[in-house]
């Protein structure tokens, strides 16, 4: 169903059955399949391909040559009806690729709200991107990667499958991340190593000085004290009782499957 206020260019192809919301615009030479749903106010520019069971929220901007909901590149994929779910107010720039999920994992690829996906970024199957993230030009998020809220993955960086980039963390350009990046940490290099906290990001997002000092102390316990992670865990657990941000920082020590960058 196409809402009466939607504007579909005559050179676009929108298959019967697609749900196109109010005030959506679709540019020329764009192709949208029958199982796609696009929320109100979203702008889909020219030469975009949106396929499969893809649901896109409100007020997104999708630039030319983006491909969303295409079959993933996992060799186990057998044509199952897996999905892509995208939230609201995202900017998806030229030639970004967002692949559908696999039944071996969550069967869906998820992008939250208010994200910037820069030119030619690749979002592989079963990735989960939170809110307010920045994925740089030509960055690659491998299958099953999680990028938490307010994190940044800069240009030409690659995140290994199954890794997590924690909230407010920042991965510098041209980096290769093969283990989890804890929340708030600044990472850089091939293979990426920690370079302190993302202090600029913390200040921009309203973290107060006492909270930042607590995070700095927690960082030193993990990375500079010479203690094992098992020795550090009870210290951070005690700090986390007073500082919720420290809990978020230390939670990954319990959940990581690939280990954290060191």
From Swiss-Prot:
Reactions catalysed, semicolon-separated, are: a (3R)-hydroxyacyl-[ACP] + UDP-N-acetyl-alpha-D-glucosamine = a UDP-3-O-[(3R)-3-hydroxyacyl]-N-acetyl-alpha-D-glucosamine + holo-[ACP]
Q: Which InterPro entries match?
A: Acetyltransf_C, Acetyltransf_C_sf, Hexapep, Lipid_A_LpxA, Trimer_LpxA-like_sf
- Reply yes or no: does the keyword Oxidoreductase apply: no
Q: Where in the cell is it found?
A: Cytoplasm
Q: State a GO cellular component annotated for this protein.
A: cytoplasm
Which superkingdom? Bacteria
A GO molecular function annotation here is: acyl-[acyl-carrier-protein]-UDP-N-acetylglucosamine O-acyltransferase activity
Q: Which GO terms describe its biological process?
A: lipid A biosynthetic process
Quick one: which pathway? Glycolipid biosynthesis; lipid IV(A) biosynthesis; lipid IV(A) from (3R)-3-hydroxytetradecanoyl-[acyl-carrier-protein] and UDP-N-acetyl-alpha-D-glucosamine: step 1/6
In its keyword annotation, does this UniProt entry include Nucleotide-binding?
Answer: no
Instruction: Give the UniProt keywords, A-Z.
Output: Acyltransferase, Cytoplasm, Lipid A biosynthesis, Lipid biosynthesis, Lipid metabolism, Repeat, Transferase
Primary location: cytoplasm
Q: What does this protein do?
A: Involved in the biosynthesis of lipid A, a phosphorylated glycolipid that anchors the lipopolysaccharide to the outer membrane of the cell.
Subunit record text: Homotrimer.
Tell me what this protein is called. Acyl-[acyl-carrier-protein]--UDP-N-acetylglucosamine O-acyltransferase
State the species of origin. Answer: Vibrio parahaemolyticus serotype O3:K6 (strain RIMD 2210633)
